[in-house]
Each structure stands twice: as C-alpha cells, then as structure tokens.
C-alpha cells in the first residue's frame, strides 16, 4: 500500500476536523497562491452543479496541491474525513483500511483511541473551489481553441503558399496541445480537408505539417482508406527519406497506422525507398528516438514476402543484427521478430546466417531479456543451425549456446520453447564427442 509522507503545511494544518483549530481563509489561500490557485483573483463564483468526480477525471492534473491528496490512494480526495490524530483521508479509503482490521493511522502508524471520522468540510470546499476554477478555465480555453481550429480549417480551404504553411503550423500546435481541438478537427470534417493537401505536387514544407497533424488525430477507416492512395503514400515515403528527424518519425507512425487497416495492400509498402528510409532511422546514432517507430513499422510489414525480399536485397539483415546489442528491451524484441520473419524464406535464412554477428548476438539474448526475445532468438538460431549445421552449430556452442539451452530447458518457460531448445541441443551435440559436449555444456555429469 502506498504511504504518504506529510509535508509541513505552514499554518494549513488547521482544517475543520483536526489540527490546531485554525480556520483557513479560502479567498486568501487561493488568491495568494498558497495552493496554486488561478492567477488573478480569489475563489470567484462557482457553479455548484459541477460534479467534483467529473472535474477531477477530466482535468487529470499533475500539479495538485499535496493537501488535496489522500495519503492512502495518492489520488485527490472527494470526501475528505479527519481522524482523531488530525490526519485527513478519503472516506472510502480509510474505511477500507479499518475493514482490513487496522486500528492505526496509516500515515503516522499511531494507535487510534477513537475510530470516529469527521467530515472535513473546509478542505472539501477548498478542493471543490480549486478544481472548479481549473475546470472553468479549461472549458473556456477549450472553447477558444475549438473556435480557432474551425477558423483555420476554413482558411486552409483557400490559403496558398506560405499562408497555407503558417495555417498548418498553427493548427499542428493546437491539436498537439488540446484534446478538444483534435476532436473538433475530426468532427468538423477537417481530416479530409487536411488529407487533400497531400499529393504529387505538395511541397515538403506543407507535407510535413500535414503528417504531423494527422498522426495526432484519431483517424477512422474512411480517413485511412483515403490516405492509401499511391500518390499520397509516395509523398509520405519521400518525406520519410528527406524530411527532418521529427518528420521521418511522423511518417513512419502514419504509415504504421495505415498498415493496421483491413483494406491495406502490401504493394503500398513494397518499395526500396520506404525500407531504405526505415533502416536509416534504425541506424541513426544521433537521433535514437527514431529507432522504435521504424521497428514498429518494420514488424507488421515484414510478414509480407515481397517486403522481406526487398529487405534482403538492400542489406537490411546485417544492419539489424549489428544494432541488437544497443537496443532497449522493447526495440530488441521488435528487431528479433523481424529477423525471425526474414528466416521464413531461404534467401532470408542465408542472409541471417552470413551475418557475422548473428550467432553471438542471439545467443547472448537467450534468458536475459524476456521470454518473447528468447523465443525469437531461439527460432533464429534453429533456422541457421538447421541450414548449415556443420558451420553454425560448433560456432554457436563455442559462444555458450549449449549452456544457455540447458537453462531454457530447466526454466519455467513455455513447453514448446523447451522442446525447441532440446531439439537444438541435440542438433549441436552431433558434432562433438559425449565428453567434449559435456564440457561445452559446463556439466560435470553425463546428460541422460
């Protein structure tokens, strides 16, 4: 259970129901910024019909004053009650604490001489006032950005040249910053307006802004279908190769969204240009934030044979293998998935086998990251050792494969994974005498 360390509240302890009995002046507290009130005024007029629970959920604020937080749940309190120790909690949470048989104060662990809880009306009113002000301000800002988003959409229908770029840039900033603006753009038919700006003669200045906006929106099937036009995809691929790092990432994310659509056609991503652009992102040592978006796109498109053939032809296999040690767990799993998919075809298996670092790097992964990574690495090793057992099996054993396989077999991994490990272990043992293989396994007794 999370525990909360109370902070010294500089005279704010005296909420009704505990402490030194001081009465907190709400107007002064908020106006003076004691609890982070809205700039420029006191409590103001609050609509008493506003629902506190709804406001807390919709605002989803991070900078909430600590005195509003329940020490048990670490969430804002909606019905604060105070114990005899002077500590305040959310009513529901403290009752759960009592129902578990605890007779102590959760924060101080002080034994309670009275389990009565007193509603802290002063704190409740302060919480309600603070959230109400934030909520009303949010609503006003939302209305402002909604109106501005609609204005910009109207401008885009007739703007040309630099005026169009400026309008798109402003709209991008608005939709990235405001959820309501994103909803408004979609509801007002803005997706079709923005998508129509992508075409064979679209400048990259316009295209990069359009893509940045589109990846921020919740696109429906019709919108994605419209973006699957070859001319639009071609422009997006061009920007994936020639745009800024941010634009390249956005292009990869947008194409990935299209790939996941039911009506997607494999030929749309079966191009040297797309794959070269993605591999550049993967290998870019200056901008590592592009690795994940690129691999997250390579994963779904690698299930298509024509894509796998192109990947082999552009030399993607050794490039993927060589970056394995530098990847974080998520990206490592994606890269191993792609390499395993490439092993589906003979040309892919040969390319994976011929990559000098395939065996040492994949052996290193076994039982070190996740079961999925172990599964993909094991599948890759099986493919290359089966393809060229006399060449690959001894090399794999020399870098510690046999001992790793025994670890997999003895672990709590999936039964199919253990079976594959046993088969690969048997395959590797064929090239050694029993005594020699036992020593390679780092065992002191014969394998039964």
Swiss-Prot record:
SMART domains xrefs: Ubox
Top EC group: transferase
Entry EC no(s): 2.3.2.27
Presence of the UniProt keyword Nucleotide-binding in the record: no
Zinc among keywords: no
GO molecular function ontology, one term from the record: ubiquitin protein ligase activity
UniProt cross-references to CDD domains, sorted A to Z: RING-Ubox_PUB
Reactions catalysed: S-ubiquitinyl-[E2 ubiquitin-conjugating enzyme]-L-cysteine + [acceptor protein]-L-lysine = [E2 ubiquitin-conjugating enzyme]-L-cysteine + N(6)-ubiquitinyl-[acceptor protein]-L-lysine
Residues of the U-box domain: 63-137
Per-repeat ranges for ARM: 179-219, 221-260
Pathway stated in the Swiss-Prot or TrEMBL entry: Protein modification; protein ubiquitination
Name the UniProt record assigns to this protein: U-box domain-containing protein 30
Species this protein is from: Arabidopsis thaliana (Mouse-ear cress)
